[in-house]
Amino acid sequence: MGMRMMFTMFLLVVLAITVVSFTSDHASDGRNTAANDKASKLMALRNECCDNPPCKSSNPDLCDWRS
């Protein structure tokens, strides 16, 4: 194989790796968004419950026991 052929193969490998990395990154964005939404909802629920004394006493695992 000549130098041009080796260089061309190198560029093709780099391009293939870039395309695979780029598409897999976009696929994970949806999972990250779903996880962030779930965490936000749980934090809102925790804040609502912990401000309400009856809910706080019913859910000690949800609220900080030291506060």
Swiss-Prot record:
Residues 1-21 form the signal peptide. Disulfide bonds join C49-C55, C50-C63. This is Alpha-conotoxin-like Qc1.1b. The lineage of its organism: Eukaryota, Metazoa, Spiralia, Lophotrochozoa, Mollusca. InterPro entries: Conotoxin_a-typ (IPR009958). Residues 51-53 are annotated as: Lacks the Ser-Xaa-Pro motif that is crucial for potent interaction with nAChR. GO terms for cellular component: extracellular region; host cell postsynaptic membrane. The keyword Chloroplast does not apply. Alpha-conotoxins act on postsynaptic membranes, they bind to the nicotinic acetylcholine receptors (nAChR) and thus inhibit them. Has possibly a distinct nAChR binding mode from other alpha-conotoxins, due to a different three residue motif (lacks the Ser-Xaa-Pro motif). Residues 22-46 form a propeptide. The keyword Aminoacyl-tRNA synthetase does not apply. Keywords: Acetylcholine receptor inhibiting toxin, Disulfide bond, Ion channel impairing toxin, Neurotoxin, Postsynaptic neurotoxin, Secreted, Signal, Toxin. It comes from Conus quercinus. GO terms for molecular function: acetylcholine receptor inhibitor activity; ion channel regulator activity; toxin activity.
